[in-house]
């Protein structure tokens, strides 16, 4: 997959930084509508030190955060939203179907389905090798910093 935004370009769009920037690159992008990002899950991730030391599994809340960051890229790279922040305002219908472990390539896809003023909703899914790991509906609140 071709890179649309690399790691440094992502940091110009969303305010997240290490160790909490959870997407490595964007491979598909439609302004304000859709974004697909990739996270290479490494055994060196800090969360694996405690989740779990002898059985490394990426925490589900971090998978949903990675999805939220992917959605934030879709929303914040538009001219009207540059310099703003997208807050994670809600999550519905979240389901985890598969564990995500070191060595996995996590594909994160978010489609924005509704915008009403500064509030947006989207459908999201995370997959590994085409297998569904997580699906949910996200709510975003865009605001000035």
From Swiss-Prot:
GO annotation terms (biological process): fatty acid biosynthetic process; lipid A biosynthetic process
InterPro entries found in the cross-reference section: FabA_FabZ (IPR013114), FabZ (IPR010084), HotDog_dom_sf (IPR029069)
EC category: lyase
Protein name: 3-hydroxyacyl-[acyl-carrier-protein] dehydratase FabZ
Protein purpose: Involved in unsaturated fatty acids biosynthesis. Catalyzes the dehydration of short chain beta-hydroxyacyl-ACPs and long chain saturated and unsaturated beta-hydroxyacyl-ACPs.
E.C. no: 4.2.1.59
Keyword flag tRNA-binding: no
GO cellular component, one term: cytoplasm
Family that this chain belongs to: Belongs to the thioester dehydratase family. FabZ subfamily.
Major place of residence: cytoplasm
Entry GO MF terms: (3R)-hydroxyacyl-[acyl-carrier-protein] dehydratase activity
Keywords: Cytoplasm, Lipid A biosynthesis, Lipid biosynthesis, Lipid metabolism, Lyase
Keyword Nucleotide-binding recorded: no
Active site, per annotation: 51
Annotated signal peptide: none
Compartments in which it is found: Cytoplasm
Coiled-coil region: none
The reaction(s) this protein catalyses: a (3R)-hydroxyacyl-[ACP] = a (2E)-enoyl-[ACP] + H2O
């Amino acid at each position: 997959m071709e890179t649309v935004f690399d790691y440094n370009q992502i940091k110009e769009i969303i305010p997240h930084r290490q160790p909490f920037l959870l997407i490595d690159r964007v491979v598909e992008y439609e302004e304000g509508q859709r974004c697909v990002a990739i996270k290479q899950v490494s055994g060196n991730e800090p969360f694996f030190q405690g989740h779990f030391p002898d059985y490394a599994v990426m925490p589900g809340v971090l998978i949903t955060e990675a999805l939220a960051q992917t959605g934030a890229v879709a929303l914040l790279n538009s001219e009207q939203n540059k310099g703003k922040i997208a807050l994670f305002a809600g999550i519905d219908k979240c389901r985890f179907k598969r564990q995500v472990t070191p060595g996995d390539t996590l594909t994160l896809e978010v489609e924005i389905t509704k915008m009403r003023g500064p509030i947006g909703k989207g459908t999201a899914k995370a997959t590994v090798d085409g297998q569904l790991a997580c699906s949910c509906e996200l709510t975003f609140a865009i605001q000035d910093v």
